[in-house]
Amino acid sequence: MAELLNVKPTRMELLNLKRRIQLAKKGHKLLKDKQDALVMEFFTIYDEALQLRRELNLKMKEAFEALQMAEIDVGTLRLKEISLSVKPNREVEIRKRNVMAVPVPLIEAESFKRNAGERGYAFVSSSAKVDLVAEKFEEVLDLAVRLAEVEETLKRLAREIEVTKRRVNALEYIIIPRMEATVKFIKQRLDEMERENFFRLKRVKALIEARGGS
């Protein structure tokens, strides 16, 4: 049996508890609907994250293969010198947006892809294979930024799902059962008190009638 609330067994408390139960059940339904919607949104974004992860792994494989070919073409030392002369790429700005009322990051950044002239290294000291390396790693950066946003969104949604689940369970298995058990107890206690009063009044009436007849 659920633990009872510490309240007086009065009709006022009974009415108050019934109202609280109605509100708790409405709150439970709203939270359950929110939980279900969050879970659906989570798995939608999870599918996107899996796809982005697969694409990123493929792009990284292509980028490192291109890097190996460039090292063979111009040499490791020269490739390092070229990499040090590359101009910084785009800046990334992190804002916030809401997904199912959950604040999640929104990474605002232009594509990292640039043409060879924007990268800053001299054409005469470079090669087509070096350009390909830069191109491939810029593609990696684009995907990595998008994946970071999606994975952080998943983490925050997962936390919100867990918090909502705990609230749903608390209402469903603790709070509402305690109030319902207390309502049942108060009803039983009020019935007992009513019967006691009835028999008390009956005895008083019998005594009065007995005295009146003597």
From Swiss-Prot:
Location within or outside the cell: Cell membrane
Gene3D superfamilies linked: 1.10.287.3240
GO biological process: proton motive force-driven plasma membrane ATP synthesis
Gene Ontology MF annotations: ATP binding; proton-transporting ATP synthase activity, rotational mechanism; proton-transporting ATPase activity, rotational mechanism
One GO CC annotation: plasma membrane
Keyword Membrane (UniProt): yes
InterPro entries: V_ATPase_D
Membrane topology, from the record: Peripheral membrane protein
Entry keywords, A to Z: ATP synthesis, Cell membrane, Hydrogen ion transport, Ion transport, Membrane, Transport
Entries under Pfam families matching the protein: ATP-synt_D
Keyword Ribosomal protein included in the entry's annotation: no
Its job: Component of the A-type ATP synthase that produces ATP from ADP in the presence of a proton gradient across the membrane.
Family stated for the protein in its record: Belongs to the V-ATPase D subunit family.
NCBIfam families tied to this protein: PRK00373.1-4, V_ATPase_subD
Subunit and interaction comment: Has multiple subunits with at least A(3), B(3), C, D, E, F, H, I and proteolipid K(x).
Official protein name in the record: A-type ATP synthase subunit D
